[in-house]
């Protein structure tokens, strides 16, 4: 029953290797290809992950006792902004694999080692998607769905970061598959199946707050599918999930009511983040309602869009596909509600990508094998596609994505609906949210022993984290200082990070007489730029 096919294992291994090849954030004299630079949240995730893994190693099961939980999770050292499970995986990866990746001996943490945790989560997600699709629809769909997932630049881009998104995607898929398997039949799931489904939902809640979407989806689906017979499985589902969630996060025990509200974002006063959308700056809770739909569509690659369109041409959707559609649409609707914060491009709703991968894979295989579609829905028999057409499609969907995913800035890649990154820039979309362009290739252009002013600075620890965690910055003895936007008092080398939502408009384009010493660009789009300013330099003020 739990035997994994060779094809699913192979595509999962390929997913891991393609992601792991580009985890080099700034190593010195490394054989690893250049990857994305250190991004904004990685330092927090690694630090907290190592802290939790060390605590687990020190206390073992006693970590889940009241006194030890208070010492560990009540400490000022602990940061409860996210549930612990995703960070534990990153911390375990760091502790277990640091010895494999040399070059970070002088830094506080080995960032590439922690990034391997995301690569592993991505590979397991690919395995689950491939195996489920294979068992449900056949080997061709399983492989094609996996290829669709691997070929999504934003998905594999996040898999190269010590971020929570890849682990969240894994937990989301793990919690979604029992629903697709047991909750799409004519009869409702058994009590055992409902409890297991609920436990996996609890694991998802322990990974990231997006887990709160799933029970709403389950209630809507079950009510429509089973009517009054949904009451029993829903009750067991909810109880099991809640128990796993509370039992797995001892921080909740310290002050249950207030801490659960903090988890849900009801009591936490967090700083406002900003989006750059069609040439305008929006606060995260004031973005137009269509932001999630537009960002998703313009971020999807051509092969995914084509697969989805092919599936839409076949009018009949089976129950599994209908539930997959619901798992895509509902999170997008939530983030479209006025006042709900949304930022960082597709990051917050990246959980919809695995479902889209299955639907796109299904679209391609139904197009290549019309007889399968006809048999599945009792339609008239149609002729099979010629072998050369199938071979051409398989070659295209496996080879074409490589150019787009095997690049350091895959996480900032736009799709064909904007004609790529250049077209997205012309439309007024954000260049990059994560400062991932500050990688080895960029830092090698910065003079040694230099003091560099930086703008904008996204949080108070950003520059210290770069100095502490990026080996090439230490090796070249580069000192980073926040620029206070006063040319007469602070002048010299100035690093402009093109996060357009935070970069002052007058700094996005510079006067022609200013020297550009280093630049990170792709397809004509600027992501970061090092210039030299004098005390007499003045930038023309523009409205933001």
Could you tell me what each predicted segment is?
Residues 136, 140, 175-196:
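Membrane-interface transmembrane helices that cradle and orient dolichyl/undecaprenyl
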Residues 145-150, 157, 177, 201, ...:
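Short helix- or helix-capping micro-motifs
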Residues 22-36, 86, 250-253, 259-267, ...:
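Catalytic lumenal/periplasmic loop and adjoining terminal transmembrane helix
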Residues 196, 210-224, 303-308, 360, ...:
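Transmembrane-embedded, aromatic-rich helix segments that form part
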Residues 45-58, 82, 88, 203, ...:
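Transmembrane-lumen/periplasm boundary regions of multi-pass, lipid-linked membrane glycan transferases
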